[in-house]
Amino acid sequence: MSDQRTIEDAVVATIKLHADFDDTNCFAYDGRALGKGLPRLVRVSYASHRRQSLTLQVDRRIWSFNVDVLVPWRGQLAEMDERVGTETQKVIDTLAKYPRLNGTADVQRTDMTVSNTPDVLLERRGTYRGRRHVLDVLEVYDPQRAE
């Protein structure tokens, strides 16, 4: 069964590989990038997980991650919201297209909780504004399948 860091890294790697992001603007939680004046960034951070035994040997774990999409606070509010929406849609489309996170061990699917009104983020450092979505990653571990 994978650990939190493995799944988190797989989410970041999938976004980098398929959603037009790179090492400078897509990362596991690290607040240092906020002060660098980047034109956009994606921050993935662990939120929680739930574990359930399906049988004596088979476990199901649901990992939850916050996926924050941020852009600098510049210009008009409507234009900035449009930029946030565009960048967010890239991430949503990528995770929908690659629900198994490029074949990361035991990941069955991912589900992005998308609402019309995601949490709005107001980051003080670097004056960024963005949206937070919750990504659930379903992992089923069966030791007989792993062999």
Language model region names:
Residues 39-43:
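A short glycine-rich, His/Asp/Glu-containing loop-to-beta-strand
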Residues 1-34, 46-147:
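Charged, amphipathic alpha-helical segments and their flanking helix caps
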